[in-house]
Amino acid sequence: MATQFPLSSEFERLTVYGPTRATVSGTPLDAEEVRKIHAFWRACNYLALGMIYLRGNPLLREPLKPEHIKHRLLGHWGSSPNLAFVYTHLNRAIRKHDLDMIFMAGPGHGAPGVLGPLYLEGSYSEIYPDKDLSEEGLLNFFKQFSFPGGIGSHCTPETPGSIHEGGELGYVLSHACGAAFDNPDLIVAAVVGDGEAETGPLATSWHINKFLNPIRDGAVLPILNLNGYKINNPTLLARISHEELENLLRGYGYTPYFVEGSEPESMHQAMAATVDRSIEDIRAAQTEARASGIARRPRWPMIVLRSPKGWTAPRQIDGHNVEGFWRAHQVPVADVAKNPEHLKLLEGWMRSYKPEELFDAEGCPVAEIREMAPAGLRRMGLNPHANGGHLKKALRIPNFRNYGIEVAKPGQIEAPNTQPLGVFLRDVMKENAHNFRLFGPDENTSNKLDAVYAAAKKFWIAEYFPEDQDGGELAPDGRVMEMLSEHTLEGMLEGYLLTGRHGFLSTYEAFVHVIDSMFNQHAKWLSICNQLSWRQDVASLNLLITSTVWRQDHNGFTHQDPGFLDVVVNKSADVTRIYLPPDVNSLLSVADHCLRSQNYINVIVSDKQLHLQFMDMDAAIAHCTEGLGIWEWASNDEGQEPDVVMACAGDIPTLEALAATALLREEFPELKIRFINVVDLFKLQPESEHPHGLSDKDFDSLFTRDKPVIFNFHGYPWLIHRLAYRRTNHANMHVRGYKEKGNINTPLELAINNQIDRFSLAIDVIDRIPEIAVSGAHAKARFRKQQIACRQYAYEHGVDMPEVAGWRWPG
């Protein structure tokens, strides 16, 4: 039995088929302007179809034949005409108002709607001369789209003017906000897909308007592309009442201007008037703030464009709805090469744009089409902000050596590892007051980076309460960006970096997983950029992971997850770096190196609590430069073959490995132990797999070819096996790490549960060395008793034994 659908009482208010509706009234365009704007849009739509369908006859100079059709039809029509419509009107605004503007396309698979205008404005051909403004160039342009050896269906790094791919939905507003920071003359037009608006990251990022200072920052103009449908379903925002949608957007702090309809001429007039009003609102807010010197939060404008999905496609194909329905999403006319009726339909559709009026005899867009685009670097495809390396200035970095701590002897004093880093970052911010920002999800103070507030407060432009004076550290000109959304912060940082600036993000280790997929997308972006000669170098994304697993004993199981490193290792070796500095001075050395680097994602793992300190500054620099090495002071094998290699990576695993080494040397003075600490995790991979990898000769020299290696690791143990599985001595490598054995513990109990503690490691060594396997039975028994005693003490007192918590290296 067919389901009966009650027709919505809001249908007449929401349908795009009927008279055009707009919040802003007026007809700013004369008839000639309407004609030219519409011609440019027609050309964009023709190009979008050509990209999806054609491998021959690009200008339909002859009847369309099956051999002109691509063998495999890929791409997405649905949002392309709507994106091209927006781009066309932004071009007009740039020319009229002399705007510095870049464009971001949030809707999924919208590249045809962006690539078309890029081609017409000439920016595409300037970067890719084989796609010039000729019939042959146009054919090359069509063929490459969604084609092996060509380009994808998103605004990939190969797309001029793009810093937002849109492959994974949800980040367009946060990227736009980051781009606008410290760019007072820039307007970032960010088209939000109405399907994209259902994602968690996008839903949260409507709040970016609380992070833009109208004095020093540029503006973001959100444009909600309300075309009504996702792949196979209606979108939520398109199916709530007009009042509810307007109230929602007003509640987020915007002034929403609606443009709704499908009839081209009246929609052009409405969109032109609305874009003009939006620019006026932006300039008025900025002018007032800059004249008064008082930064208040404006009610920024945004545009809601309600128009048909797949606009200008046939309303129906084979008796089924297409334009204005989800069937327009991908390839509306299928099986074209084999179905003569479909071929005829496609040809009629393409000819409806009248390509003979849009391109001259040589295949070049006619002059009036080209004149609709801005000139030079005002073209959004060539705006330098969208290739941020053109604008990047080197950071002024103070000498990190001046922020270290004195370490007279290894393993004797404690210090909070991240606190001196905060002092270092404070002075980085002082020296770079216009191109460096610090990001954190309400955790910078918790992560002991709060020294930065002496140089720059936390940005805050919402309401203030009297109690904020008591340590709130809030200011409308702050440069520390805090919001409890890792997604939004990561997006802001990416947008900031890709437009030529520098930044640093810290977050809790367990919850960095929130941005796993964002990390993936940025790594992919950088990897492709490294292959494009025209893409300029950008600053690396520096990510400090702290509040780490081994000091989350008090917060419990949910806060214990070091698995982000596994995610990082999956990505291309040309962009990923992982560092696990064990103490203050090594952390400072690593941070300095990362801040100076380009085109990488640097992941630094360092806990914030008090930890033993092992290296003076000179030793730390030498050790970090090598990436790993033997700690002579903890080893006793000099000039001899070791009986065992004790290796470690991470602050707590290093402490426990040292304590185990001390226990073993006390019990078995003749035992030759080589102690190796690893800072640069990718040193473990062969040099053929990662540029930082050790040669096999160097690896074998350090880790031996046949001796047991006990490796105490910060993360999940199998990651070390993944990295080192090709090594000669891998069969003798025994890795200890986090194994999901956690709860509310003391630090040592958590270590015992996961067998990274000193006693478990010492027992492991005894079991691996035949010469002491039997004679060591008494020592093993004592170590097990000590484990039991430590547990009992923790259960009774809630803390570790003083001799454990206060352990020092006995050297």
Curated annotation (Swiss-Prot):
Pfam families: XFP, XFP_C, XFP_N. InterPro entries: Phosphoketolase, THDP-binding, Transketo_C/PFOR_II, Xul5P/Fru6P_PKetolase, Xul5P/Fru6P_PKetolase_C, Xul5P/Fru6P_PKetolase_CS, Xul5P/Fru6P_PKetolase_N, Xul5P/Fru6P_PKetolase_ThDP_BS. One of its GO terms (molecular function) is aldehyde-lyase activity. The keyword Lyase applies. Its EC number is 4.1.2.-. One of its GO terms (biological process) is carbohydrate metabolic process. The keyword NADP does not apply. Its cofactor is thiamine diphosphate. HAMAP family: Phosphoketolase (MF_01403). Belongs to the XFP family. This is Probable phosphoketolase.
